[in-house]
UniProtKB/Swiss-Prot annotation:
<dbReference type="GO" id="GO:0046336">
    <property type="term" value="P:ethanolamine catabolic process"/>
</dbReference>
<keyword id="KW-0143">Chaperone</keyword>
<dbReference type="InterPro" id="IPR043129">
    <property type="entry name" value="ATPase_NBD"/>
</dbReference>
<dbReference type="GO" id="GO:0031469">
    <property type="term" value="C:bacterial microcompartment"/>
</dbReference>
<dbReference type="InterPro" id="IPR050696">
    <property type="entry name" value="FtsA/MreB"/>
</dbReference>
<comment type="pathway">
    <text>Amine and polyamine degradation; ethanolamine degradation.</text>
</comment>
<dbReference type="InterPro" id="IPR009377">
    <property type="entry name" value="EutA"/>
</dbReference>
<comment type="similarity">
    <text>Belongs to the EutA family.</text>
</comment>
<keyword id="KW-1283">Bacterial microcompartment</keyword>
<comment type="function">
    <text>Reactivates suicidally inhibited ethanolamine ammonia-lyase (EAL), cyanocobalamin-inactivated EAL and O(2)-inactivated EAL; requires Mg(2+), ATP and adenosylcobalamin. Reactivation probably occurs by the ATP-dependent exchange of cobalamin.</text>
</comment>
<dbReference type="GO" id="GO:0030091">
    <property type="term" value="P:protein repair"/>
</dbReference>
<protein>
    <recommendedName>
        <fullName>Ethanolamine ammonia-lyase reactivase EutA</fullName>
    </recommendedName>
</protein>
<dbReference type="Pfam" id="PF06277">
    <property type="entry name" value="EutA"/>
</dbReference>
Length: 467
């Protein structure tokens, strides 16, 4: 059996906390001898995980770059791992941290200093999907062929990911979390974040000083927070819930058969701390309010495989050298790195499906760089190729983008597709890379052309989650 072993790292930089997880990944080539390699994870073993530590942020809300790097390198040292010995990795920045003014440059600099890592600055949709995968909700949904809703409740947000038979069918994000009111060790509020203040104002009147709230009033606030979280599940939102939504709603009329709770508040829901203010916030009180909520008690709430560590544990990477002149490459400056892949779910409406896939990745179709994947089940027939061409032309017309049009396909018709597409998109840099197998959540690198431009090396990077 053709297998590869990798030492990988997953770094999750969240609103409140950061964590580092080292893993040993084993991949097996499932392709036949004559086919392009197609690797899948067969073993994912967490070899070391750091304590959860607070994300270093300055008073202006920016990430403290040097301090963050020092903290992460300390975890390498504690694990007894040298940065150069790591084969692959993923850095995910989520929640309010992803919105800080220097988030992207700070994480890119960190990635370059540590190695060849996937970097994802996750907005509310992608954060929901990553947490749902990391918690094990996607696997549970796939194994039981049912609808599973994971709600990842952290410091600043509650992120919802709905899986139907293993496929993501909806995401949402509500600005409710356990650290919206920060406290001292005695439960006195020392700082109220804006969404937290909005909830306080609704409970006790506009202009209420959150620092004056009693313990009983904090319980009242967290009960309202729990109600807001449940309103999103039911799809009946109060004006306050509507104001706190960061995204659209979950699909209407769809009832999850299982609900799982992850994130820091999910961990408190599972193991309630004796001291409700041990984290200097109201997270444990919110977990208690969720426990006591009558509507949640009616639902099938189960503990997920992971709660506070519902995140990536690394990334598997494998290089594919593409065969002879099967690709189309014109006007594209290579190499390109860390390109997210948009995979269409609905094959009958490719334009809408690509747009939806980009929304799930928190990407703007008109400004961001990405790769459009073709459906794996698309037949290698002339009629199917024409359908794809019409969809790509329509997509480019609806979403003009300064980046090259990059298309990836598992089928062996890259050259034909490129030749037929070129006359209709005359000024647009275009690459069609075929015989590459990609899955939801993958990123790819496209290397410098070889053999006179007929072959490019492509690296497919798949995020790894706890097994």
């Amino acid at each position: 059996m053709n297998t590869r072993q990798l030492l990988s790292v997953g770094i999750d930089i969240g609103t409140t906390t950061t964590q580092v997880i080292f893993s040993r990944l084993e991949l097996v080539n499932r392709a036949a001898v004559s086919q392009v390699p197609r690797y899948e994870f067969i073993k994912r073993e967490i070899s070391w995980q750091s304590p959860v530590f607070f994300t270093p942020v300055d008073k202006q809300g920016g990430l403290k770059e040097a301090e963050l790097k020092t903290l992460i390198l300390e975890q390498y040292h504690a694990a007894g791992i040298e940065p150069e010995s790591v084969d692959s990795g993923a850095i995910i920045i989520t929640g309010e941290s992803a919105k800080t003014r220097n988030a992207r440059p700070a994480v890119m600099a960190l990635s370059q200093s540590l190695g060849d890592f996937v970097v994802a600055s996750a907005g509310p949709h992608l954060e929901s999907v990553i947490a749902g995968h990391g918690a094990g909700a996607q696997t549970l949904s796939e194994q039981r062929l049912c609808r599973v809703l994971n709600i990842d409740i952290g410091g600043g947000t509650a992120n919802y990911a709905l899986f139907d038979a293993g496929k993501i069918s909806g995401t949402a994000c509500l600005n409710v979390g356990g650290r919206l009111l920060e406290t001292d060790s005695h439960g006195r509020v020392v700082y109220a974040h804006k969404p937290g203040q909005m909830i306080v104002d609704e409970c006790f009147g506009a202009g209420t000083d959150a620092r004056s709230l009693t313990g009983a009033q904090l319980v009242q606030v967290t009960r309202r927070m729990a109600e807001l979280i449940v309103e999103v599940i039911d799809g009946t939102l109060s004006p306050l819930a509507q104001a706190l939504m960061q995204t659209g709603l979950l699909p209407a009329g769809v009832t999850p058969e299982i609900i799982t709770l992850s994130g820091g508040v999910g961990e408190c829901y599972r193991h309630q701390p004796a001291d409700p203010f041990c984290f200097a916030d109201i997270g444990p009180l919110l977990a208690t309010a969720l426990h006591d909520h009558p509507r949640l008690r009616e639902m099938n709430v189960q503990f997920p495989a992971q709660t506070v560590r519902a995140t990536v544990i690394g990334a598997g990477a494998h290089t594919l050298s593409l065969s002879g002149s099967t690709i189309w490459l014109e006007g594209v400056q290579l190499p390109l790195r860390n390109l997210p892949v948009a995979i269409p779910i609905d094959e009958t409406d490719l334009v809408g499906a690509w747009q939806q896939a980009l929304i799930q990745l928190d990407l703007d179709p008109k400004t961001d760089a990405y790769v459009l994947a073709l459906p794996a089940s698309l037949p290698v027939r002339y009629a199917a190729v024409l359908t794809v061409i019409n969809a790509l032309v329509d997509f480019v017309a609806r979403f003009p983008n300064p980046h090259p049009l990059l298309v990836v396909a598992g089928q062996d018709f890259g050259k034909a597709l490129g030749m037929l597409l070129r006359p209709q998109l005359q000024q647009l840099p275009l690459a069609v890379i075929d015989e590459v197998i990609v899955r939801a959540g993958d990123y790819i690198d496209i290397g410098t052309p070889l053999f006179g431009g007929s072959v490019v090396p492509v690296t497919v990077k798949s995020l790894a989650f706890p097994s």
